[in-house]
Amino acid sequence: KIKIQNTYKKKPIFILGMPRSGTSLIEQIVSTHSNVYGAGELTILPKIMHKSIWDKYTNPEELLTFIREEYLSKISEFNVNQEFVVDKMPFNFFYIGFILKSIPEAKIIHIHRNPMAVCWSNFKANFFDNVGMNYAHKLETIGEFYLIYNEIMKFWSETYSDSLINIDYDKFVIDYETSSKNIISDIGLNWENEILKFHENNRVVETNSLLQVRSKVYQDSSKNWKKYKKHLSPIMEILKNNNIEF
C-alpha cells in the first residue's frame, strides 16, 4: 500500500477485457449516467507503464505513487463536470494489479465474452491500421493472444477477486436492464432511468463498435462465429488444447 498524499476530484472507471468483448457497449451504458464521463480508449496508462519507469523507480512505493500521480493528474485535465471518468482501453487488463495498488479508489469492470465469439470478432474487424492489434491479422495469433489474456485474467481474478466487477457479456445481453442496474450499484452510483436509453447517447465513439452502441442490445452476436466454424479450426484447436470451453 502507498500513502495517499494527493486526492483528485476525478475517479477512474476502467473497462477492460479482450478487444471486441463488449467494452464499448458497457462504456456507453455507464457513461449515460449523469455523473460519468466516457473518455474512450485512453493511452495514458500504457504510456506510463513504459519500460523506462522500471529503471527510474526501483522502490515499489515510489513506483506506485508515480503511477497514481501521473494517471490521476492526466484525467483531471478533462474539463467536465462528472466525477467519474471511464477509460475503456481494453489492454489495461495487463495492469490491473498496478491500478488497484496505486489507485485503490478506482473501479475496474472486466468483461468476458464467449472465447470463439470474441476471437472471431477480432479477426473480422480488420484492425490493419492499428499497430497494437497486429495479433488480430492471423487466426493462430488471435488464439495465442487469447491464451495470454486468459492466463493474466485468471491470475488477477484469483488475486483480487473482491476488487473486480466481472461481467459475462453473453448473460448481460439477455437481461441488460437488471445487469446495468447491478453495474451502476457496484460503482457506487444511484440508478437513473435514462441509462436504459443508452443508444440515444450521442457521445463520440471512435471504435468499430459505433453501430452497436447506437442500437439497442443485440442478443445473438456471440453465435455468429458458428457460421464460419469450418474456417476457424486454428483458433478452436488452440482453445481446446488449453481446456478453454466455448
Model segments located where?
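Phosphate-binding active sites in nucleotide-utilizing proteins
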Residues: 6-101, 111
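A secondary-structure boundary/capping signal
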Residues: 41, 168-169
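Acidic, metal-coordinating catalytic cores used for nucleic-acid/nucleotide bond scission
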Residues: 90-92, 171-175
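Conserved beta-strand scaffold positions in the cores of enzyme catalytic domains, especially
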Residues: 38, 108, 164-166
